[in-house]
Amino acid sequence: LYGICGEATAMNTLQLITDNGDTLNISIEHARDNNMVFGGLEAMNKMAVLLAPDSSAIEVINLSSMLGNWVEPNPLDGSSMQGLTIKESGIATSIENTVTYKTWRIFNGKLLLTYINEGSMNDNETVDTFEIKSLGNDSLTISNPNENHQFSRRR
């Protein structure tokens, strides 16, 4: 479920103005108790919400807070920084990286990154799925079974 965080959002309730124009008041107590509210709850920010069968939130992701430049030390030698830029409208670009990022989106509470691996025999687009572990003002941690990334925001 996607929408905008409303001004009536409180500690345990998210007011979500959905992309369809409906206004919903969603309990986020379960998500908050399980540390599954990522990026904070700021009015007018774009949000993604994964709902339980009882319409309470399992996971809440502040999409607006994901936007920006995210870098980490190069895992090969640590001497340089690499990463990605997450932009509006699902656009992703690379920062000094061996992969060329193309797109990003949140689907079922996961971050999907589409990229092309430069210099490989296969120049087809690949999609990697990541679990968001943390999202703060200056940090983003994502992981899947094959890799873990701890990014810092580059201003």
Model-derived regions: residue spans:
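Tryptophan-anchored aromatic micro-motifs
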Residues: N62-S79
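Short, charged beta-turn/beta-strand-edge "cap" motif at the junction between a beta-strand
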Residues: A8-M11, L50-A57
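N-terminal glycine/threonine-rich, aromatic-flanked beta-hairpin/loop signature
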Residues: L1, D77-L112, I116-D123
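Beta-strand/loop nucleic-acid-binding surfaces
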Residues: G21-F38
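Structural detector for short beta-strands of small beta-barrel domains
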Residues: L1-T13
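An anionic, turn-rich surface loop/hairpin at beta-sheet edges
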Residues: I26-A31, K110-S134
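Short nucleic-acid-contacting surface segments enriched for D/E, G, S/T with interspersed K/R
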Residues: D33-V49
